[in-house]
Each structure stands twice: as structure tokens, then as C-alpha cells.
């Protein structure tokens, strides 16, 4: 089952937490859920060039707090914060609550599965060879500390008459191990031959404590360095000592 299920949903409550963090009674639950979906869809389409990793929505008492994780926060904020004020007003119009907007920078987009998938999709739309795009993404992720990565591309790859699925993997991606910190993201590339689907799994190491917030806290602290990265750091320090 670990091979088939969404790795993030599989680990909810273990080392991952929900992107919508609020409670509601039955009367207003459906309305709030639709508001969340509407806001997420709007942000992802409106800020396509800003590299949106995820949108977290929290609802304290009669308020709505939206946190956007982005690789390019400057594009969202705009000159002197003009763009972020417009975005806050548009989001406020979608909900009846007072809306607060936070922007969080993704410091390592190369090891964020959603951003990697979006990057490959953009390259396919620019007619870059899919194998080259996949290999480049894998090498960048492994260089920046990922312990393993798997990428699949499906569709009429290279303009072929028959659709097929191609995949590339490097390192370990243990989908059955619940303590594994696995990031998962998808994207669609709208090419001249049709839509190609991209899926990305990135293994960032193991989280031994039972804490639903552990994965997010680890990403925010920039503690995504795997053993390969630490080994390279040790090798660099060893060479510096030898040269000295």
C-alpha cells in the first residue's frame, strides 16, 4: 500500500500535519472547506511564477491566517508591499473572516517536491528533453542533502504517438517506512502534444520522534541536510586540515 498511497496523507499525525488547521461544526464545515479550496486554487494560479510550495490556512476565532510558502517571496510582496496588500484584499473577499497573510521563504527549493515538479513541468513546456530535466533535478536534490529522490513523467513524452511513463531514481525512497520524512509533489505540463503529469518523491531522512509538526519544523530550521551532505562537509574540512 505504501507504493500507491499519497505519502503525505499516509504520515498525517505521525510526522506530518494538515495544511488546513481549524475546527468547525457541521453547519459551517462545508462552507469553510470550499473557501480553503477556492483560496488555494486562486493563490496557485495567480502566483504561478512565485514558486508556491504550499498554502497553510489556520482559522483562529473569527479570523483567517493564510501562510504562503514560496521560493520567490519578493514577487508576492512587490515594491513597498503593494502587491501583498492587493492579494490580502482579494483573499478577504473570498471569506467572511478578517484575513492575515504571512509569506515564508523556501530556502532550498531543490529539495521541495512540489517546486521540483513545477520546475520540471515548466522545462517540458519549453521543450527541454524530459530525461535531461529529470536528471538535472535529481542531481540538484542529491547535491543539496536529499537522501533519495524518485521522479516519474507520464504522457506523450517527446511528442511520441503513444503515451508512456518514464522514471528516474537515485538514493533511497522508503515509502513503507512511516518514520521516513518523505516529501511528495505533483505538477502538470501543458505541452503542444497534450498534458504530461510529473510526480516527485524526496526522502530527507528519518524522524524518530512522534510529532506531527516535526517535518515542518525541520524544513523551517533548514535541517534538511542528509548524511551525504554531512559527509561532504566532513570531507571538505579534512582537505582543509591537510592543506594547512
UniProtKB/Swiss-Prot annotation:
Residues 229-244 have a biased composition (Basic and acidic residues). SUPFAM superfamilies: Prokaryotic type KH domain (KH-domain type II), Ribosomal protein S3 C-terminal domain. SMART domains: KH. GO terms for molecular function: mRNA binding; rRNA binding; structural constituent of ribosome. The keyword Nucleus does not apply. Residues 214-244 are annotated as: Disordered. Keywords: Ribonucleoprotein, Ribosomal protein, RNA-binding, rRNA-binding. GO terms for biological process: translation. Residues 39-107 form the KH type-2 domain. It comes from the Bacteria. Pfam families: KH_2 (PF07650), Ribosomal_S3_C (PF00189). One of its GO terms (cellular component) is cytosolic small ribosomal subunit. HAMAP family: Ribosomal_uS3_B. Binds the lower part of the 30S subunit head. Binds mRNA in the 70S ribosome, positioning it for translation. Part of the 30S ribosomal subunit. Forms a tight complex with proteins S10 and S14. PANTHER family: 30S/40S RIBOSOMAL PROTEIN S3, SMALL RIBOSOMAL SUBUNIT PROTEIN US3C. Belongs to the universal ribosomal protein uS3 family. This is Small ribosomal subunit protein uS3.
